[in-house]
């Protein structure tokens, strides 16, 4: 264990159950860590921004069961100047794991309802009409479904590490790691992977075994050391040592996949969402074999939308916000400048389209 991780672990232990979010330090800023009740179940929000009049950016994390709250200070610090950034631990995840959501509530439809139930009071509280919705991996499924159901709530929708045809994506991901194992003559990996099979592993704990090999072969993270990730996690003031341990052991993701795996593996947005009425963006890693980029290209090509754009992160796999945080934030800031206008969102859209046609 590296000295950095040991130091971070010691600091996390000292923190024990005391969690907080650092003050913003600006006259019109906000820094809140608090629970809210969404459709009868308590769920936690982290809200940070230097100016409460800025547009709302809602981040929908992946998994299901994989929080983004612990990454807020690493991946969204600059964004706090331009947005009111909202990180939400969905039911069954992170700080929203307990008291334990009813098993029957762990459905895609319920998560979509939770998302809408979160957006509406946020808009009312901050006196705004629309949010910028960003979904990562599993969160990209929610984002697209919310965009289809309630486009009136959104400036635009962004899919990062976009899930498209989940069963086909899992098969491609499985074949990638198996091919890499054969290429390096890794007998142990070949034996383990051949015992697992393809997309069927998604509904079993075998998914997590496949993901460990995917991390090794760069299809999850291409340009980020796992030790650095652990250090970021352990230094998160919003999370207790218990929250950190749960993330490291993948407790929440295992809980969620065991209850939702059969439904989630069947997601196929190529069939379910052929068109959207809001601007759509895709943030895609050039080495992503978790939600393979070839399927994102296919979805991008087939999707009908008033405006759409595919933005490549050439040095990333499935985690562009972690692997290229500066570019991730620059792209969102530029997007906000063009699309997040309360007064004239359509004028901003037309101006952007004309500029790109020049």
Predicted regions mapped to residue ranges:
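Conserved acidic catalytic loop of the alpha/beta-hydrolase fold
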Residues: 110-130
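Catalytic active-site module of serine/aspartate enzymes centered on a nucleophile-bearing elbow/loop
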Residues: 309-358
């Amino acid at each position: 264990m590296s000295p950095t991780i040991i130091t971070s672990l010691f600091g996390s232990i000292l923190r024990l159950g005391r969690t907080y979010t650092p003050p913003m330090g600006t006259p019109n800023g906000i820094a809140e860590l608090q629970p809210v009740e969404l459709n009868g179940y308590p769920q936690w929000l982290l809200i940070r921004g230097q100016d409460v009049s800025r547009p709302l950016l809602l981040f929908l994390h992946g998994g299901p069961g994989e929080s983004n709250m612990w990454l807020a200070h690493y991946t969204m610090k600059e964004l706090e100047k331009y947005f009111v950034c909202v990180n939400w631990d969905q039911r069954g995840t992170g700080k929203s794991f307990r008291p334990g959501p009813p098993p029957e509530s762990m459905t895609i439809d319920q998560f979509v309802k939770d998302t809408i139930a979160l957006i509406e009071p946020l808009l009312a509280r901050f006196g705004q009409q629309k949010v910028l919705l960003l979904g990562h991996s599993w969160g990209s499924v929610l984002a697209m479904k919310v965009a289809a159901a309630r486009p009136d709530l959104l400036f635009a929708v962004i899919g990062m590490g976009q899930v498209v045809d989940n069963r086909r994506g899992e098969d491609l991901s499985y074949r990638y790691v198996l091919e890499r194992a054969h290429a390096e003559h890794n007998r142990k990996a070949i034996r383990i992977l051949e015992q697992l099979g393809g997309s069927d592993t998604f509904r079993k704990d075998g998914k997590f075994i496949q993901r460990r090999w995917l991390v090794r072969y760069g299809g999850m993270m291409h340009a980020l050391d796992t030790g650095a990730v652990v250090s970021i996690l352990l230094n998160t003031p919003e999370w207790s040592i218990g929250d950190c341990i749960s993330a490291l052991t993948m407790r929440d993701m295992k809980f969620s996949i065991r209850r939702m795996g059969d439904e989630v593996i069947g997601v196929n947005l190529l069939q379910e969402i052929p068109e959207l009425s809001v601007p759509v963006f895709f943030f895609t890693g050039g080495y992503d074999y978790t939600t393979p980029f070839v399927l994102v290209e296919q979805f991008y090509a087939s999707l009908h939308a008033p405006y759409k754009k595919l933005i490549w992160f050439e040095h990333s796999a499935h985690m562009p916000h972690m692997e290229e945080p500066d570019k991730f934030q620059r792209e969102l800031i530029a997007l906000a400048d063009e699309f997040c206008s309360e007064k004239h969102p359509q004028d901003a859209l037309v101006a952007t389209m004309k500029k790109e046609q020049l």
